[in-house]
């Protein structure tokens, strides 16, 4: 464990220096890791674990996702099974189905949770809102979590590049006395950059807040608002998109991601610098009440209720596609499609 200062607050983190890959292999040497679900997080975690030398199998229903698993080298009947077979064979059952899928499959999964097995999550949703999901693990199994702070695709890409994606970790239930060791070993196995401790409740709450806030919901709302204002005042789609999205994603985002917002402010034009310093507090004051409202909606379980209710509707997928199609057809993103085609790396040489 390493002590690190995060903005004046000391936290304990774990990296491969404190918990080596060799130690992780030793901790999990007698385990059969069953990755249940090969959708979003499943491929990255399963392939990283396999490449790091762990005993991994995959459980997936037939369909396109099953075919993807085959294409990734998982062999039917050897390392690729039905969900039921994988759950029976596995000693660590990794619940990497969607939140809705976890609720649906729980009656099946719990049949195979024999004493001493481990139930693994990468999101606290099902456990934290168990009153709504019905997911209540038996007392004689370990319940652990490693939650990558990014997509499964990013986890795999960074692993293949020799880098790691930061992860939070938590132990909800330690029936064997070895739950924390298994958790840290699993984090190293999937290719964590560094790991920081949390709880299922804090992970679920912060994750839903982030997705609805600055990571997805708020950023779409902010970008669209600026784009619309520019267009309504006579700016072309190309100009509006470049000043709203392209410069952010291709130039500024990588800069403040690598060096910090303060560095970016210190290394831009004086005009941009002055304007940003003056307007940032106004946006903060306008947005913070909405963020507080959002956090309350998450914390009280309202967002979980909305998610579960929506996913339980038989026509949800059709309705979702209509919503995504509406976003896809927004002028801003149609303009963006053309802008992306014009990037040098997308030009025919």
Residue map of PLM features:
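NAD(P)-dependent Rossmann-like dehydrogenase/reductase catalytic/cofactor-binding core
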Residues: 2-6, 11-17, 232-349
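NAD(P)+-binding Rossmann beta1-loop-alpha1 motif at the extreme N-terminus of oxidoreductases
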Residues: 2-77
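Structural motif
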Residues: 32-34, 55-57, 78, 91-95, ...
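Gly/Ser/Thr-rich loops at beta-strand to alpha-helix junctions
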Residues: 38-43, 62-63, 100, 119, ...
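Rossmann-like NAD(P)-binding element
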Residues: 61, 70-128, 136-151
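Small-residue helix-packing motif on alpha-helices
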Residues: 66, 86, 102, 237-241
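Rossmann-fold dinucleotide-binding core
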Residues: 120-212
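Active-site-proximal catalytic alpha-helix in oxidoreductases
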Residues: 177-232, 238-256
């Amino acid at each position: 464990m390493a002590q690190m200062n995060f903005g004046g607050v000391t936290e304990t983190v774990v990296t491969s220096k404190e918990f080596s890959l060799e130690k992780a292999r030793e901790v999990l040497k007698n385990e059969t890791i069953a990755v249940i679900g090969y959708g979003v997080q499943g491929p990255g975690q399963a392939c990283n674990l396999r490449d790091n030398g762990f005993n991994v199998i995959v459980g997936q229903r037939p369909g396109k996702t099953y075919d993807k698993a085959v294409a990734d080298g998982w062999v039917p009947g050897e390392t690729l099974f039905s969900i039921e077979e994988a759950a029976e064979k596995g000693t660590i059952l990794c619940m990497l189905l969607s939140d809705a899928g976890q609720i649906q499959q729980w009656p099946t999964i719990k049949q195979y949770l024999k004493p001493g097995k481990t139930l693994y999550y990468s999101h606290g949703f099902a456990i934290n809102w168990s009153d709504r999901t019905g997911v209540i693990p038996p007392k004689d199994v370990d319940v652990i979590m490693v939650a990558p702070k990014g997509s499964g695709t990013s986890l795999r890409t960074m692993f293949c590049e020799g880098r790691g994606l930061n992860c939070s970790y938590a132990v909800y239930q330690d029936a064997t006395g070895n739950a924390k060791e298994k958790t840290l070993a699993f984090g190293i196995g999937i290719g964590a950059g560094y790991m920081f401790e949390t709880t299922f409740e804090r992970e679920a709450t912060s994750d839903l807040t982030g997705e609805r806030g600055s990571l997805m919901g708020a950023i779409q709302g902010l970008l669209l608002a600026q784009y619309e204002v520019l267009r309504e005042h006579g700016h072309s789609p190309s100009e509006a998109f470049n000043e709203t999205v392209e410069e952010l994603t291709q130039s500024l985002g990588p800069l403040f991601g690598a060096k910090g917002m303060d560095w970016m402010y210190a290394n831009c034009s004086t005009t941009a610098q002055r304007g940003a310093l003056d307007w940032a507090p106004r946006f903060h004051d306008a947005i913070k009440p909405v963020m507080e409202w959002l956090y309350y909606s998450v914390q009280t379980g309202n967002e979980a209720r909305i998610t579960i209710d929506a996913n339980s509707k038989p026509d949800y997928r059709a309705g979702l596609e209509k919503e995504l199609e509406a976003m896809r057809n927004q002028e801003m993103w149609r303009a963006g499609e053309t802008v992306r085609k014009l990037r040098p790396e997308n030009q025919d040489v």
